[in-house]
């Protein structure tokens, strides 16, 4: 799939040298974004193939957060034709309970300034962490406006390595979940050595990136509408699970049609706009009555991209 990937590594310090392992993670993630269903037929989503502009900002192992932040800012500023960004890296440390991390705050700043959206992996537990001990998500998965993705097993349960929210006690993170592989079945990817199987939130997020890119670039929806449709499809009509601190609003359907279309007994309205301070809008939606009553149930999914400021708490 190399013809579908445009690779850039000019922001990596050449003095750090090259290790073959540096290419493994990015190659595996790219293989899912380009054509994940070719390797995982059961996850065929109907989105087709995507071209990827891949920017290497970190090497295998530990890296400088300052250098990564500087690189990401430069990349977004100089590639403003890209709206959907996939970010599969994260801290092994827990996000602080009472403040947004510098990494998360910068993603929120870039999203507000350039009208982009980041799909961020929900970060994994390490081999040293107990599977039974809760661990909060790490930076930059505490970004308020990013679409943060956790992983599930093939049994549609939180994967053993997933971490949990919330952020600042009231922002539900992760936002959503998707299959990322676990003990009962792993994800097939293309690695530098050929086809391999793996697991992790880094391999759940690219599937959501595919769906988000389809909604934005093929269906020409705004990032707000696209994000809202994905979360709405994940939440469904069922009560929120007790695992919502790990699953977010729910598990996203596999097929893109299940995000775009509704069953014959449902009607979906998408209302979108920009509201300034003190402005109010009223929408009259004609709904038939029966015996003087409205014989239906309704739910609303509200999605917005607030301007965040770490100095103000968010």
Predicted feature descriptions by range:
Residues 1, 135-213:
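Extracellular S/T/G-rich loop segment that most often corresponds to the catalytic His/Ser-adjacent loop
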Residues 1-11, 15-65, 115, 143-145, ...:
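Subtilisin-like serine protease catalytic core
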Residues 57-139, 197-199, 203-204:
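Substrate-binding/access-modulating region of protease and related hydrolase catalytic domains
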Residues 61-62, 92-96, 126-129, 155-157, ...:
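Flexible loop/turn segments at secondary-structure boundaries
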Residues 89-91, 122, 152-153, 302-306:
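Short beta-strand segments enriched in hydrophobic/aromatic residues
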Residues 219-295:
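C-terminal subdomain of the subtilisin-like protease fold in secreted/lumenal serine endopeptidases
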Residues 294-313:
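A short beta-strand element within beta-rich, extracytoplasmic domains
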